[in-house]
C-alpha cells in the first residue's frame, strides 16, 4: 500500500514549495466560496438561469487571453512577485464584490465585470505557479510536486464550495466574500515569505511577438492543442455554475 501513498517529499524538503502550496490551498478555498457566492447573488438579484450562466461566459475570453500572456510574463518576470500581485488583485476584486453586496441595490453589471477580472488574474497566475515549481523543488521531486498541486486543487474544489454553501445559507453572500478576503490575506502573507524566483538571464522582455510565437507553437503541436480544447470544453460545458444557486 505504501507505493500508493502521497509523496510528501517536496513539502518536507522545500520550505518555499510548502509556502506556495499552503498559500494556494487556502486562497483556493476562498475562491471556491466566491465561486458559489457569485451565482447565488445573481440568482437572488434576477431569478434567471441565463443571468447566472452569463457570469461564466464573461470569464472565458479573459481567461484565454491572459492565460496566454501569463505564460509570457512568467518567463520574463519574477514568478513570486507575479503570483503575489495577482493574489493582491484578487483580494481587491473580492472587496469590490463585498462592498457591492452590501449596497441597497447591488450592481449586476459590476458583478459581471469583476468576474471577468477574476478570470484574467487567474490566467496570469497559473502559468507563474507552474513555472515556479522547477525552481522550488529538486528534479527528482517534480512528479510528486505536480501531484501535490493537483491534490491541492481537488481538495479546494470539493471542500471550498461546501464551505461557501454553508456560509451563504447560514449567514449571507457578504460573509462568503469576507471569508474569501481573509483567505487572500493569509495567502499574501505566506507568499511574502517565499524567496524571489527571478527569470533566467536569457529571458526576453514580454512582448506581443512573444505571445504570437507561443500561440503559433501551440497550434503547431496537435497534442498541446488537444489538451487546450479538452480543458476549454470542460470549463465551458461541465462547470455547473448555472445550477449552483437553484
Task: Place the predicted regions along the sequence by residue.
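Alpha-helical transmembrane-bundle signature of multi-pass membrane transport and export proteins
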Residues: 1-246
Amino acid at each position: 500500500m505504501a507505493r500508493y501513498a502521497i509523496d510528501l517529499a517536496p513539502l518536507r524538503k522545500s520550505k518555499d514549495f510548502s509556502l506556495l502550496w499552503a498559500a494556494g490551498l487556502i486562497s483556493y478555498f476562498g475562491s471556491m466560496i466566491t465561486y458559489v457566492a457569485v451565482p447565488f447573488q445573481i440568482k437572488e438579484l434576477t431569478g434567471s438561469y441565463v443571468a447566472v450562466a452569463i457570469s461564466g461566459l464573461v470569464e472565458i475570453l479573459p481567461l484565454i487571453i491572459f492565460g496566454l500572456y501569463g505564460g509570457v510574463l512568467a518567463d520574463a518576470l519574477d514568478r513570486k512577485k507575479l503570483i503575489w500581485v495577482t493574489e493582491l488583485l484578487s483580494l481587491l476584486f473580492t472587496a469590490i464584490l463585498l462592498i457591492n453586496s452590501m449596497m441597497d441595490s447591488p450592481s449586476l453589471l459590476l458583478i459581471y465585470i469583476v468576474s471577468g477580472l477574476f478570470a484574467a488574474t487567474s490566467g496570469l497566475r497559473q502559468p507563474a505557479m507552474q513555472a515556479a515549481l522547477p525552481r522550488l523543488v529538486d528534479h527528482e521531486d517534480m512528479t510528486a510536486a505536480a501531484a501535490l498541486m493537483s491534490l491541492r486543487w481537488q481538495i479546494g474544489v470539493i471542500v471550498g464550495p461546501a464551505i461557501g454553501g454553508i456560509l451563504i445559507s447560514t449567514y449571507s453572500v457578504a460573509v462568503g466574500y469576507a471569508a474569501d478576503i481573509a483567505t487572500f490575506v493569509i495567502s499574501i502573507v505566506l507568499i511574502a515569505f517565499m524567496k524571489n524566483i527571478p527569470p533566467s538571464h536569457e529571458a526576453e522582455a514580454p512582448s506581443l511577438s512573444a505571445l504570437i510565437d507561443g500561440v503559433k507553437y501551440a497550434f503547431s503541436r496537435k497534442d498541446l492543442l488537444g489538451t487546450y480544447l479538452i480543458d476549454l470544453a470542460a470549463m465551458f460545458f461541465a462547470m455547473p455554475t448555472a445550477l449552483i444557486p437553484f
